[in-house]
């Protein structure tokens, strides 16, 4: 992504290693020298966090770090979380003011979702509307394990969109891509 000053960045990582950010050379597409793996933003001890994406929103002057938490399968509760910063390389704070660098599993833990559950503002997760009486032949309606998103800000219209994949009730692990408009609340947090 490009920051407000036109500098190119790459955010990457998942699960065991955590989420990192590197400043890139826009001419070569390679990382700028001397950064190693980059600056760590969050994650430790096999935390199920992946799919980082950063969007700068000029109306709020924040950088939004989108992440997918939890297991990927339909039953595993995959969901999208968000944190924000005034600078591209953080620190990123959630809506409770928690620094995301503290988000991660306990030492020696392995995929303990409860260790990371309190971090990041939850933007979307699984939901379901069951059939009403008289609609017994209709499947439940809803999303299962939405996540692994990207986002875009349209400069011409001033609108923001989130692009993600999701599964559906009664369809197993089959998934599709969805696009939804995002809106900013009065505190500058995205809503879908």
Predicted regions and their residues:
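Carbohydrate-active catalytic/glycan-binding domains of CAZyme proteins
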Residues: 1-192
């Amino acid at each position: 992504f490009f920051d407000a000053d036109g500098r190119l960045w790459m955010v990457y990582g998942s699960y065991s290693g955590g989420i990192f950010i590197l400043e890139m050379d826009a001419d070569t597409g390679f990382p700028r020298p001397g950064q190693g793996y980059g600056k760590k933003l969050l994650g430790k001890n096999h935390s199920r966090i992946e799919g980082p994406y950063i969007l700068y929103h000029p109306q709020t002057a924040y950088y939004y770090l989108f992440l997918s938490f939890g297991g990927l399968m339909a039953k595993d509760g995959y969901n999208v979380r968000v944190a924000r910063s005034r600078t591209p390389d953080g620190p990123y704070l959630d809506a409770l003011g928690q620094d995301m660098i503290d988000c991660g599993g306990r030492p020696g833990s392995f995929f303990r979702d409860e260790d990371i559950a309190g971090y990041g503002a939850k933007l979307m997760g699984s939901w379901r509307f069951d059939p009403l009486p008289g609609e017994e032949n209709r499947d439940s309606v809803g999303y299962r394990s939405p996540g692994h998103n990207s986002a875009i800000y349209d400069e011409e219209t001033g609108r923001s969109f989130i692009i993600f994949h999701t599964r559906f009730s009664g369809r197993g692990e089959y998934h599709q891509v969805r696009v939804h408009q995002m809106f900013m609340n009065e505190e500058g947090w995205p809503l879908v």
